[in-house]
Amino acid sequence: RYARVALEAGKHVIVEKPLAPSAAQTEELVELARRKKVFLFEAVTTQYLENYAKIRELLPRIGTVKLVQCNFSQYSSRYDAFCAGDVQPAFDLACAGGALMDLNVYNISYIVGLFGEPNRVNYAANIDHGIDTSGILTMDYSGFKAVSMAAKDCGAPARYVIQGTKGYLLQKSTANFC
């Protein structure tokens, strides 16, 4: 809502992730920015971090990629309130809340930035009070699979593993701290 107002006023806009709750809304914002001749950016910067460039550089050393695993799971400080009926933006569908849009977007950006758009995508979520509190997104690429996990209802150490025929790359931090 605020992004649209700023674009209509002819302002350049940086939007926190996700850019919009749906592809259709994203296209509307992009078209508006083009018409107004202003810039519209999403604030996910993972692909521009120095260590991300290093991962890209090291990928050929592990041979043919076969499996990719990304896990960004952190017990939300707002989860208990959510369970008690206090729905804050992080758990509000109208605000693009939930595990997919709040956390898994970093995993997806990481994977798609390295390997491009997948052939198929499937999302299996744990739904609580109508919103995904955790879930697993699988991406099917020609020759390999990627699994992207995110949770707001439980925690685990961040772990990113890219497995190839000659080795693997392991990152022990979230994608946005690449």
Each model region followed by its residue ranges:
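Alpha/beta-hydrolase-fold catalytic nucleophile elbow
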Residues: 16, 71, 163
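Structured beta->alpha junctions
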Residues: 18, 44-47, 72, 127, ...
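A short beta-to-alpha transition loop/helix N-cap that caps and shapes the active-site region
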Residues: 22, 75-80, 156-158, 170-172
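Predominantly a Rossmann-like dinucleotide-binding segment in NAD(P)-dependent oxidoreductases
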Residues: 46-119
